[in-house]
UniProtKB/Swiss-Prot annotation:
HAMAP family: Ribosomal_bL27 (MF_00539). PROSITE patterns: RIBOSOMAL_L27. It is found in: Plastid, Chloroplast. Belongs to the bacterial ribosomal protein bL27 family. Transmembrane segments: none annotated. The keyword Transmembrane does not apply. Keywords: Chloroplast, Plastid, Ribonucleoprotein, Ribosomal protein. It comes from Trieres chinensis. GO terms for molecular function: structural constituent of ribosome. InterPro entries: Ribosomal_bL27, Ribosomal_bL27_CS. The gene is rpl27. This is Large ribosomal subunit protein bL27c. GO terms for biological process: translation. It comes from the Eukaryota. One of its GO terms (cellular component) is mitochondrial large ribosomal subunit.
């Protein structure tokens, strides 16, 4: 019986590209309409005042203003654009 594995293909050796998720604009930062605030999987952050949500759950600014983070309730973080 051979003690070496044959030179066939392996089932491992794959990895997906990083998706660059996360917060892109932080609290207190000035933003313009259309700026991306958060890239996320699922609704980790919920859209608040003057914030829109894309089909991939990306949150973006609807108006110019300053980013503000708060809590909708004990679990859910919300992002607003003030002013």
């Amino acid at each position: 019986m051979a003690h070496k594995k044959g030179a066939g293909s392996t089932k491992n050796g794959r990895d997906s590209n990083a998706k660059r998720l996360g917060v892109k604009r932080f609290g207190g930062q000035r933003v313009k309409a259309g700026n991306i605030l958060v890239r996320q999987r699922g609704m980790k952050f919920t859209p608040g005042l003057n914030v829109g949500c894309g089909k991939d759950f990306t949150l973006y600014a609807l108006t110019d203003g300053i980013v503000n983070f708060d809590y909708k309730n004990a679990q859910q973080k919300r992002i607003n654009i003030i002013g």
